[in-house]
């Protein structure tokens, strides 16, 4: 080893593949990085002489191994590595140098001298023999320890000594009696491993086995293994590697394996491991077996009685361990999830080697592949390249010969790029240099231009004072005017010396005018004005800023802290430069605090206060004589804003605060203005239950304007400060909507929880109905207190599990909030919030109601009303209620409280003296509503006014004209009638009276009146002699009841208004008073006007013990309304109903004597796909009238037509008319009048069927002088005249339906048909003229042969050979041939099938709605011989899927098919599919396009599977068709087919094992003859079945299925014709033919014969063409003659 400078660690790394293979042979897993770390860094620190370069010295290896395996402070993760080191030293491979091998041998034979061991210390605790094995039972008894061996055996190192039985080690050393021992107490290196089964002496026989003794695992080992490894579900590789190493190194027993399974795995994981292990039990042939006896023998679930001191016992234990490890690996396999692997991306600062380890770990966790195997190297390499950092990825993708690079080579290349990356400082320096260089390039042209300008100025200034001459003689220069130059101290004005001209006393000084100089002409000019400066505190430091409104950003000269990454280019007078921005800085201005980022410009003369900060501070600059002054904006004005539905509050007069300050002092903790937000302390957190199958929904936040975001920010911040909102991370998200409060610029946050409300379970709403809430308030209680709870919903806590449902996005960069927020209290907008709060508050206030019966407490969600008969009771009750609310944690709004008053406002009502009034604010709201212009505005008006309908008598009558305008489907036209109704409602609202509160101790009286289809009434109670109104009721009757007689409409009105009155009376006695004898009508109802169900409903409501009817009265309060004022006289309702029942008083239903008798009937049936109908009239001997009716006429309609025609033909006569139609009979006698009275409308307000025929019948019924319409049974066999006449009418109806004479209309009587009179003699044409006439007629109509023949027959022309001429003309029409469809009738042929199963398959894709795992296609294979079907769900419809299923499913189970049939889909014609067929020798037959009948068997199976899946989904309630597919296949494979055999029986020769199959054959030899007999019989049965089916499938005599021959001209069908495009194209020349398809010239694919038809013969003589001319109104028609004709 010393000659080649190689070390043991370098040798192992250079031959790492061999080392890893050796580790696999030892059933352990090692990694290269950890191998190097443990050898060079970890083991040298143990202090046993391990060198950093490694060693093969067994003494040192065993010393390290002892520390690794020790009980306390051991290293379980290093066990596989030291075991492999030991194996390398004991069994050195060839690449270990000879010197190392010699050193090993010499080292193993040389005893190591050790220090004498010190005498053992006395134990602290007494020795205990019982070992705690957790919850596992005691292991089976093992033989006692044998005496110490006389000579050392070859176990452990050769020089190691066997341990003395009196000196226990292993797990016993970890017990309390051995815990003080030190590993260093041993005299030499110890090779013993702490094993559950360890050798205790020499074998008893020379060639016997070494006896073993059981040493259980210690609790510390189990705890370390449990805590130092991740769970099996998170990372199966960790525990799998641990147990593999334990199985090899510790040799655990069956009990130890169960203990490890129980400690290290969960119940579900343990069951999965055991199940997978039992699947991997090997049989005698070395393959996994399914025999239960062999499985139980090799892998028992109960404790076996194995003797581990025998060879058989040890062999069984070895098999058990191997099987358990195989089950562990099988359970560790996870479904392939490559998406998780693709999510592993290299971090910005992550080394490539670490990234590769993470990537390979992801492959192990999320795929069943081994990333270190050779087969997966390419996939791992591609993932490593594709998921690396962008710069590394770019470099690796440009490598040449990338396919030849290994993973190690790729990591090396990636490391080069990684280490060449620039640091953050280098990057900033580079960016700075680039910015400077960019700035220099930009300023270079400017500097050039500036240089030119300066040069021009200098040259211009120099040329102004020069002369053209004397350029070289400077001494001779003189002024231009010839005056001598002045001396230095000479005055230019007076020429005296001693002063200058500006100081000359002789010069007259002119007073300068005070003007404002706009330029200073180069001088300093006037003194500048004082500049406005302010001092602000930035991060605690006062800084004086110069206010500069021209600066866009505020500037600091020093950063005063950290500088952010943001940079800005500043353009100045000397050029541009890049300057940084600071991070957020805190500014204090008086009581305000603002955070702001400043631009740092060191060259700036002073800090600047720019427009950005001035705007944020709302600064104001004022200029005065003292100088400019800067002031900061005041606080925003606060406005009170109400909801839209509470707009009436804007018109309410301010209620003077009646709260005595003593109330605020007595109860300081209940008022929201003082105590803050409340919290219900006795209500548990609310748990929101989701619907079954609900999945998280994330709705993106809507765009929000800056103004709106700034408006709702204070509200969000307030809730954050109070803890009502908290940050969160949730898969749920709903948008936040800023709603602007009307009349102000303030916004409030409203969360759109509609998607959440859809996915949350509904609960029954228990919120009281405000309509009848005040009914429980006694009128004698006239002292009231009204309390309004503040932030009511926020008083209830929301369970933490339900809080993520209500998350929303919120970003506030100034406060540092970015992400999601959610509510910790019950949110507003949640559909169940009112019900949940109402129930919680009701439960909390239940004790108060029980302890205070002297007051009445009404609760509507968060609005409370306390009522009492006296002031003292009201005051005491209010005080106790406030105390109770304070104790419960609720808060009351002091501003809205109304305490101990006689007049209060509650729920929009004014309560006073036991009555309720409409508040003036509500009236003002309705009065200020403008005239509606849209249907929605009409609905809003009716909704707002409808709230006050109890105070408006006859509201439904007043609003009736407006209801049609609420529909969006009709045009909105506002007429005078609508305006009057609109004004009348407002006028009635102004005069609304006071309504008395219902007194439940007194009876009620309900006055009813019905006018114009509207039920009106007034509910009253008596007060002395007066009747006080409680409520005015009105409602519109339904369309059916509106058509009844007046008496019956009164019954419907009573039933309708009694329902509304019950909401106020709460089930008290009610007396009904009307102007009709209602009780007699209800008890003896007419059977012709209403159905039994409706009458039963009315009787259940009205014939009640609490409802009584008073005698009819002429005057009642309901008639005081502004309608007809005439009094209705008292009448007899039975007489009026009798008069209004029929349409004709003398109409009889019994035959009249001595008058003619007619029989009518109607028939309707379907023939040739069309519904035909006919109607006749017979008199018993002959047909009076008969006609066919238009196609699609029903039998009921035909009956009405026949009866109407009979009545018309009998005009002015006496007649008996029989009909067997109950529909026609009832319409004539009863229903017709009812239909007409109600406007021929159904109960839903729609037109009834056969409306026109019913009106015609009602008109015709008055035409005869006397008439009797009698009903007779149909289809009678008797010989009486009625039965005979009915049968003749039925036969005549069928004959009339098949006739060609169609009744044009049914509203006018039909005259009897008279034979046509021959007026003129027909004219005969020659054959040529006749053919020309037919040709011209066909060009005008383009009719077919039959219709054209009928048309010609109606003319007065005689044409020879008419039929042949018509056929010839129609067959030669080119337009008809290109457009008309053709029906082909051919003999049914036989499809080609296989001669045995698995030979001929048909395959097809069918699309189904998306199912589980994204499967939305079904790939169906069907064996044409047996009908056996195979179906596979797929995500895509590709050729790879087809090939995969053929190779993996069809070939292994059925063999290589000879023929595959499919359509021309892309997945079947692809090169991959056809190439596979070629390689396997499969004849892949592609069917003709647009001919699904060619794949009829698989297409029919597609339909069968879909229908079966639909039925199974309806039966089981399941929605995933993938789960139901096996059941559908089971039904398809076991459904009898054409021969009465199922596909299963044809394929396997016997019935499916669904039912009990009789005796089973065992493995005993006695059953071999029986088994042989069964097999022989099976072969015979299957052969007979196959031969019979094969004989049936043989093709018969070959017939010509189509008439097309080679050389024919044919037309080909267009399968997708466009608008106004011919159905056929062509003509084409036939080139080749088969029995079913034709090959034509010009089309590449074969065309099925059903898609062809013969081309018409073209006219050989001439053709016409249409040409366009230059004139826009002219066209040129040109005739061209065929050249061949010439």
UniProtKB/Swiss-Prot annotation:
<feature type="binding site">
    <location>
        <position position="1290"/>
    </location>
    <ligand>
        <name>Mg(2+) 3</name>
    </ligand>
</feature>
<dbReference type="Pfam" id="PF00665">
    <property type="entry name" value="rve"/>
</dbReference>
<keyword id="KW-0449">Lipoprotein</keyword>
<dbReference type="InterPro" id="IPR015416">
    <property type="entry name" value="Znf_H2C2_histone_UAS-bd"/>
</dbReference>
<keyword id="KW-0479">Metal-binding</keyword>
<keyword id="KW-0540">Nuclease</keyword>
<keyword id="KW-0695">RNA-directed DNA polymerase</keyword>
<feature type="compositionally biased region" description="Basic and acidic residues">
    <location>
        <begin position="1316"/>
        <end position="1325"/>
    </location>
</feature>
<keyword id="KW-0862">Zinc</keyword>
<feature type="binding site">
    <location>
        <position position="1161"/>
    </location>
    <ligand>
        <name>Mg(2+) 3</name>
    </ligand>
</feature>
<keyword id="KW-0519">Myristate</keyword>
<feature type="region of interest" description="Disordered">
    <location>
        <begin position="1304"/>
        <end position="1325"/>
    </location>
</feature>
<feature type="region of interest" description="Disordered">
    <location>
        <begin position="110"/>
        <end position="199"/>
    </location>
</feature>
<dbReference type="GO" id="GO:0039660">
    <property type="term" value="F:structural constituent of virion"/>
</dbReference>
<feature type="zinc finger region" description="HHCC-type">
    <location>
        <begin position="1338"/>
        <end position="1376"/>
    </location>
</feature>
<feature type="coiled-coil region">
    <location>
        <begin position="407"/>
        <end position="444"/>
    </location>
</feature>
<dbReference type="InterPro" id="IPR043128">
    <property type="entry name" value="Rev_trsase/Diguanyl_cyclase"/>
</dbReference>
<dbReference type="Pfam" id="PF00078">
    <property type="entry name" value="RVT_1"/>
</dbReference>
<dbReference type="Pfam" id="PF00077">
    <property type="entry name" value="RVP"/>
</dbReference>
<dbReference type="GO" id="GO:0003964">
    <property type="term" value="F:RNA-directed DNA polymerase activity"/>
</dbReference>
<feature type="compositionally biased region" description="Basic and acidic residues">
    <location>
        <begin position="419"/>
        <end position="442"/>
    </location>
</feature>
<dbReference type="Pfam" id="PF00075">
    <property type="entry name" value="RNase_H"/>
</dbReference>
<dbReference type="InterPro" id="IPR001878">
    <property type="entry name" value="Znf_CCHC"/>
</dbReference>
<dbReference type="GO" id="GO:0004190">
    <property type="term" value="F:aspartic-type endopeptidase activity"/>
</dbReference>
<dbReference type="InterPro" id="IPR036875">
    <property type="entry name" value="Znf_CCHC_sf"/>
</dbReference>
<dbReference type="Pfam" id="PF02093">
    <property type="entry name" value="Gag_p30"/>
</dbReference>
<feature type="binding site">
    <location>
        <position position="1199"/>
    </location>
    <ligand>
        <name>Mg(2+) 2</name>
    </ligand>
</feature>
<keyword id="KW-0511">Multifunctional enzyme</keyword>
<feature type="active site" description="Protease; shared with dimeric partner">
    <location>
        <position position="548"/>
    </location>
</feature>
<dbReference type="InterPro" id="IPR040643">
    <property type="entry name" value="MLVIN_C"/>
</dbReference>
<keyword id="KW-0255">Endonuclease</keyword>
<protein>
    <recommendedName>
        <fullName>Gag-Pol polyprotein</fullName>
        <ecNumber>3.4.23.-</ecNumber>
        <ecNumber>2.7.7.49</ecNumber>
        <ecNumber>2.7.7.7</ecNumber>
        <ecNumber>3.1.26.4</ecNumber>
        <ecNumber>2.7.7.-</ecNumber>
        <ecNumber>3.1.-.-</ecNumber>
    </recommendedName>
</protein>
<dbReference type="GO" id="GO:0044185">
    <property type="term" value="C:host cell late endosome membrane"/>
</dbReference>
<keyword id="KW-0064">Aspartyl protease</keyword>
<dbReference type="Pfam" id="PF00098">
    <property type="entry name" value="zf-CCHC"/>
</dbReference>
<keyword id="KW-0694">RNA-binding</keyword>
<dbReference type="InterPro" id="IPR018061">
    <property type="entry name" value="Retropepsins"/>
</dbReference>
<feature type="site" description="Cleavage; by viral protease">
    <location>
        <begin position="195"/>
        <end position="196"/>
    </location>
</feature>
<dbReference type="GO" id="GO:0003723">
    <property type="term" value="F:RNA binding"/>
</dbReference>
<dbReference type="GO" id="GO:0003677">
    <property type="term" value="F:DNA binding"/>
</dbReference>
<keyword id="KW-1043">Host membrane</keyword>
<dbReference type="InterPro" id="IPR001584">
    <property type="entry name" value="Integrase_cat-core"/>
</dbReference>
């Amino acid at each position: 080893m010393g000659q080649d400078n190689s070390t043991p660690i370098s040798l192992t790394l250079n031959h790492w593949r061999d080392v890893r293979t050796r580790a696999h042979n030892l059933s352990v897993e090692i990694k290269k990085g950890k191998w190097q770390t443990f050898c060079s860094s970890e083991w040298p620190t143990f202090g046993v002489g391990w060198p950093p370069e490694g060693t093969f010295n067994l003494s040192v290896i065993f010393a390290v191994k002892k520390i690794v395996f020790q009980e306390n402070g051991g290293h379980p993760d290093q066990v596989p590595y030291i075991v492999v080191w030991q194996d390398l030293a004991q069994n050195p491979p060839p690449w270990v140098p000879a010197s190392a091998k010699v050193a090993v041998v010499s080292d193993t034979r040389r005893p190591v001298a050790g220090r004498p061991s010190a005498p053992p210390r006395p134990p602290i605790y007494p020795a205990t023999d019982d070992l705690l094995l957790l919850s596992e039972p005691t292991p089976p008894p093992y033989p006692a320890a044998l005496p110490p061996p006389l000579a050392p055996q070859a176990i452990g190192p050769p020089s190691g000594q066997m341990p003395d039985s009196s000196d226990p080690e292993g797990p016993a050393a970890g017990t309390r009696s051995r815990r003080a021992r030190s590993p260093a107490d041993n005299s030499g290196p110890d090779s013993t491993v702490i094993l559950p089964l360890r050798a205790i002496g020499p074998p008893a026989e020379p060639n016997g086995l070494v006896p073993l003794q059981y040493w259980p695992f210690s609790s510390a080992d189990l705890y370390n293994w449990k805590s130092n490894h991740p769970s099996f579900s998170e990372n199966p590789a960790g525990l799998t590697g641990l147990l593999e190493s334990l199985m090899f190194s510790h040799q655990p027993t069956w009990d130890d394996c169960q203990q490890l399974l129980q400690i290290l795995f969960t119940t579900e994981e343990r069951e999965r491991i055991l199940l997978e292990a039992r699947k991997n039990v090997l049989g005698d042939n070395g393959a996994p077996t399914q025999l239960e006896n062999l499985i139980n023998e090799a892998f028992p679930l109960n404790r076996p009685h194995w003797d581990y001191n025998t060879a058989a016992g040890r062999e069984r234990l070895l098999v058990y361990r191997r099987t358990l490890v195989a089950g562990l690996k099988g359970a560790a396999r996870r479904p392939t999830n490559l998406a998780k692997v693709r999510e592993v991306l290299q971090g910005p600062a992550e080394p490539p080697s670490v990234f590769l380890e993470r990537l390979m770990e992801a492959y192990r966790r999320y795929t069943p592949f081994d990333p270190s195997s050779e087969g997966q190297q390419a996939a791992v390499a591609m993932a490593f390249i594709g998921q690396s950092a962008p710069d590394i990825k770019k470099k690796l993708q440009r490598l040449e010969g990338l396919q030849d690079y290994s993973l190690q080579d790729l990591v090396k290349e990636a490391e080069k790029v990684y280490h060449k990356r620039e640091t953050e400082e280098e990057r900033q320096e580079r960016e700075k240099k680039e910015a400077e260089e960019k700035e220099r390039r930009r300023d270079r042209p400017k500097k050039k231009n500036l240089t030119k300008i300066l040069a021009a100025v200098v040259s211009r200034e120099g040329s102004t004072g020069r002369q053209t001459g004397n350029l070289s003689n400077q001494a001779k220069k003189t002024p231009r005017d010839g005056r001598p130059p002045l001396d230095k101290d000479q005055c230019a004005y007076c020429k005296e010396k001693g002063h200058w001209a500006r100081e000359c006393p002789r010069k007259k000084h002119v007073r300068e005018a005070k003007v404002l100089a706009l330029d200073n002409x180069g001088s300093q000019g006037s003194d500048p004005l004082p500049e406005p400066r302010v001092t602000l505190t930035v991060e605690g430091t006062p800084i004086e800023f110069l206010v500069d409104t021209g600066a866009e950003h505020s500037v600091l000269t020093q950063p005063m802290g950290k500088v952010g990454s943001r940079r800005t280019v500043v353009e100045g007078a000397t050029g541009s430069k890049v300057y940084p921005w600071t991070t957020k800085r805190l500014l204090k201005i008086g009581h305000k605090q603002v955070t702001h980022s400043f631009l740092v410009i060191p060259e700036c003369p002073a800090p600047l206060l720019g427009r950005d900060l001035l705007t944020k501070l709302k600064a104001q600059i004022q200029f005065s004589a003292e100088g400019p002054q800067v002031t900061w904006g005041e606080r925003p004005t606060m406005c009170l804003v109400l909801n839209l539905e509470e707009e009436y509050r804007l018109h309410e007069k301010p209620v003077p605060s009646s709260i005595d300050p003593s109330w605020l002092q007595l109860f300081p903790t209940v008022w929201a203005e003082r105590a803050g937000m409340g919290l219900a302390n006795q209500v548990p957190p609310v748990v929101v239950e989701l619907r079954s199958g609900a999945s998280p929904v994330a709705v993106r936040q809507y765009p929000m304007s800056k103004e709106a975001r700034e408006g709702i920010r204070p509200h969000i911040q307030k809730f954050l400060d109070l803890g009502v909102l908290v940050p969160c991370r949730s898969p749920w998200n709903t948008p936040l909507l800023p709603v602007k409060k009307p009349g102000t610029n303030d916004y409030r946050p409203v969360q759109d929880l509609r998607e959440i409300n859809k996915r949350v379970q509904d609960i029954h709403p228990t919120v009281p109905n405000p309509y009848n809430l005040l009914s429980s308030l006694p009128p004698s209680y006239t002292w009231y207190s009204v309390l309004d709870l503040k932030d009511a919903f926020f008083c209830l806590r929301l369970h933490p599990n339900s809080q993520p449902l209500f998350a929303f996005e919120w970003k506030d960069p100034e406060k540092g909030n970015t992400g999601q927020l959610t509510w910790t209290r019950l949110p507003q907008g949640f559909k169940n919030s009112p019900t949940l709060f109402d129930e919680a508050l009701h439960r909390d206030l239940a004790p108060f109601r029980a302890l205070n019966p002297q007051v009445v407490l009404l609760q509507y969600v968060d609005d409370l009303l306390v009522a009492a008969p006296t002031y003292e009771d009201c005051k005491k009750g209010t005080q106790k209620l406030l105390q109770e609310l304070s104790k419960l944690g609720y808060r009351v709004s002091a501003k809205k409280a109304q305490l101990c008053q006689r007049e209060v406002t509650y729920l929009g009502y004014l309560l006073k003296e036991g009555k309720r009034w409409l508040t003036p604010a509500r009236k003002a709201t309705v009065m200020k509503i403008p005239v509606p212009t849209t249907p929605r505005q009409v609905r809003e008006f009716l909704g707002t006014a409808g709230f006050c309908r109890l105070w408006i008598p006859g509201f439904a009558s007043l609003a009736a004209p407006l209801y049609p305008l609420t529909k969006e489907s009709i045009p909105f036209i506002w007429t005078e009638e609508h305006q009057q109704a609109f004004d009348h409602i407002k006028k009635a609202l102004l005069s609304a009276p006071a309504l008395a509160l219902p007194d439940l101790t007194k009876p009620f009286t309900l006055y009813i009146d019905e006018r114009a289809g509207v039920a009106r009434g007034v509910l009253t109670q008596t007060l002395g002699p007066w009747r006080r109104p409680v409520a005015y009721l009105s409602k519109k009757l339904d369309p059916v009841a509106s058509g009844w007689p007046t008496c019956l409409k009164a019954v419907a009105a009573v039933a309708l208004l009694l329902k509304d009155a019950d909401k106020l009376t709460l089930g008290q006695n009610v007396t009904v008073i009307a102007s009709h004898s209602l009780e007699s009508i209800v008890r003896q109802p007419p059977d012709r006007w209403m159905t039994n169900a409706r009458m039963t409903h009315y009787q259940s409501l009205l014939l009640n013990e609490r409802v009584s009817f008073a005698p009819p009265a002429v005057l009642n309060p309901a008639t005081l309304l502004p309608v007809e004022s005439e009094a209705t006289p008292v009448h007899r309702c039975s007489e009026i109903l009798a008069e209004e029942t029929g349409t004709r008083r003398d109409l009889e239903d019994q035959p009249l004597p001595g008058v003619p008798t007619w029989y009518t009937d109607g028939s309707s049936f379907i023939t040739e796909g069309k519904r035909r109908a006919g109607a006749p009239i017979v008199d018993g001997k002959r047909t009076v009238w008969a006609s066919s009716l238009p196609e699609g006429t029903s039998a009921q309609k035909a009956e009405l037509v026949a009866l109407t025609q009979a009545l018309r033909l009998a005009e002015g006569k006496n007649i008996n008319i029989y009909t067997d139609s109950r529909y026609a009979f009832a319409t004539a006698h009863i229903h017709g009048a009812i239909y007409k009275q109600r406007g021929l409308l159904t109960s839903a307000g729609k037109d009834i069927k056969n409306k026109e025929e019913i009106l015609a019948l009602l008109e015709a019924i008055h035409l005869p002088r006397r008439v009797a319409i009698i009903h007779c049974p149909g289809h009678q066999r008797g010989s009486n005249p009625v039965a005979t006449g009915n049968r003749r009418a039925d036969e005549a109806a069928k004959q009339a339906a098949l006739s060609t004479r169609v009744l044009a209309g049914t509203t006018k009587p039909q005259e009897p048909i008279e034979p046509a009179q021959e007026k003129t003699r027909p004219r005969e044409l020659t054959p040529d003229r006749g053919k020309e006439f037919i040709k011209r007629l066909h060009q005008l109509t383009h009719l077919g042969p039959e219709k054209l023949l009928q048309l010609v027959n109606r003319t007065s022309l005689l044409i020879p050979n008419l039929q042949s001429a018509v056929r010839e003309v129609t067959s030669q029409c080119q337009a008809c041939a290109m457009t008309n469809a053709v029906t082909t009738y051919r003999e049914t042929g036989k499809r080609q099938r296989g001669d045995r199963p698995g030979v001929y398959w048909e395959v097809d894709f069918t699309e189904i709605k998306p199912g589980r795992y994204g499967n939305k296609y079904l790939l169906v294979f069907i064996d044409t011989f047996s009908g056996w079907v195979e179906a596979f769900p797929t995500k895509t419809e590709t050729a790879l899927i087809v090939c995969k299923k053929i190779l993996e499913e069809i070939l292994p189970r059925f063999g290589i098919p000879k023929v595959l049939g499919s359509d021309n889909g892309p997945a079947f014609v692809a090169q991959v599919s056809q190439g596979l067929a070629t390689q396997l020798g499969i004849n892949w037959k592609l069917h003709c396009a647009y001919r699904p009948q060619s794949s009829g068997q698989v297409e029919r199976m597609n339909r069968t599977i879909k229908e079966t899946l639909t039925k199974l989904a309806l039966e089981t309630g399941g929605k995933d068709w993938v789960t139901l597919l096996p059941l559908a296949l089971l039904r398809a494979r076991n459904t009898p087919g054409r021969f009465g055999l199922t596909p299963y029986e044809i394929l396997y020769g016997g019935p499916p094992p669904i039912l009990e199959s009789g005796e089973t054959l065992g493995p005993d030899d006695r059953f071999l003859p029986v088994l042989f007999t069964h097999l022989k019989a099976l072969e015979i049965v299957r052969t007979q079945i196959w031969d019979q089916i094969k004989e049936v499938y043989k093709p018969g005599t070959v017939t010509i299925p189509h008439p097309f021959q080679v050389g024919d001209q044919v037309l080909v069908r267009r399968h997708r014709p466009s608008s106004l495009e011919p159905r056929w194209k062509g003509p084409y020349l036939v080139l080749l033919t088969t029995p079913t398809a034709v090959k034509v010239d010009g089309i590449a694919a074969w065309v099925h014969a059903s898609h062809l038809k013969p081309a018409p013969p073209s006219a050989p003589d001439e053709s016409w063409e249409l040409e366009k001319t230059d004139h826009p109104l002219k066209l040129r028609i040109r005739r061209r003659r065929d050249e061949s004709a010439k």
